[in-house]
C-alpha cells in the first residue's frame, strides 16, 4: 500500500508494474520516478522523471491525471497512454482512447496513435517506438496498427455531395435570406458501421477494445 507522497523509483535496467486502487495499472521504465496525490477531482500521478505507460481504468465522475512538472497536465477517464518526461520537457503518446493534454493554458485532445510534446526541441517519434520498452509492446503495436487500418478504411467511405437545391426551398417563408441544406448522411453512417463491425469481428485487438468500451 502506498501512502500519500511515497515515491516509487526504478533503478537502471529495472521494471515495475503498479496497480492503483481503482484498477488502473502504471508500467514503469527503468530510471523512472513518480508519486501519487488524491483529491475530490481524482488521483494525480506526479511523474518526476522517466517514462510510464498507463492503462487507466474507467473513472466514473473522477479523473486520473498525470503532472509532468513542466506545466503539463494530462487528464483521462479510461484509456491507454504513455508519458515520457525529461529535462527538456515531456512527450505524451496515446495508444487507445483519448486524453486531454493541458500545457501552458492550452488544451489539446489526443486520440489513439497521436502524440504531442511540451517543447519544440523534443523530437516526435512513432508511438510504437515510444512504448517499445514495455512488456506489452507487441499487444500495443497490434492495437495501434488495427486502429490505423480502421481509420484509413473509414476515411475512404464515400461522403454525400453538397446539396445546393431542394424541393423544400419553395416552402420557405418569403424573405428568407439564408438556407442551409444538409446532405443525407444515412448511407455513410450505415457503411461506416458495417466496416467497424466487420473489422471488430476480424481483429482481436479491436474486439478487446470494443468489449471494454461496451462494459464502461
Language-model segments: what does each one mean?
Residues 1-137:
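Flexible, surface-exposed loop/linker segments and immediately adjacent secondary-structure boundaries
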Residues 138-216:
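Structural boundary/hinge residues at secondary-structure and domain interfaces
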Amino acid at each position: 500500500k502506498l501512502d500519500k507522497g511515497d515515491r516509487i523509483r526504478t533503478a537502471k535496467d529495472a521494471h515495475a508494474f503498479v496497480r492503483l486502487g481503482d484498477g488502473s495499472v502504471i508500467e514503469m521504465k527503468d530510471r523512472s520516478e513518480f508519486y501519487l496525490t488524491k483529491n475530490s477531482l481524482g488521483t494525480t500521478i506526479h511523474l518526476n522523471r522517466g517514462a510510464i505507460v498507463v492503462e487507466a481504468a474507467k473513472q466514473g465522475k473522477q479523473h486520473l491525471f498525470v503532472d509532468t512538472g513542466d506545466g503539463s497536465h494530462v487528464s483521462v477517464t479510461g484509456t491507454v497512454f504513455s508519458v515520457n518526461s525529461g529535462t527538456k520537457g515531456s512527450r505524451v503518446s496515446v495508444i487507445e482512447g483519448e486524453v486531454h493534454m493541458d500545457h501552458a493554458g492550452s488544451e489539446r485532445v489526443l486520440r489513439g496513435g497521436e502524440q504531442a510534446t511540451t517543447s519544440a526541441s523534443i523530437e516526435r517519434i512513432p508511438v510504437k517506438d515510444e512504448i517499445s520498452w514495455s512488456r506489452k509492446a507487441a499487444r500495443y503495436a497490434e492495437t495501434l496498427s488495427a486502429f490505423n487500418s480502421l481509420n484509413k478504411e473509414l476515411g475512404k467511405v464515400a461522403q454525400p455531395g453538397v446539396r445546393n437545391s431542394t424541393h423544400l426551398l419553395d416552402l420557405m417563408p418569403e424573405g428568407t435570406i439564408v438556407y442551409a441544406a444538409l446532405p443525407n448522411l444515412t448511407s455513410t453512417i450505415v457503411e461506416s458501421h458495417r466496416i467497424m463491425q466487420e473489422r471488430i469481428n476480424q481483429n482481436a485487438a479491436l474486439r478487446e477494445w470494443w468489449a471494454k468500451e461496451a462494459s464502461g
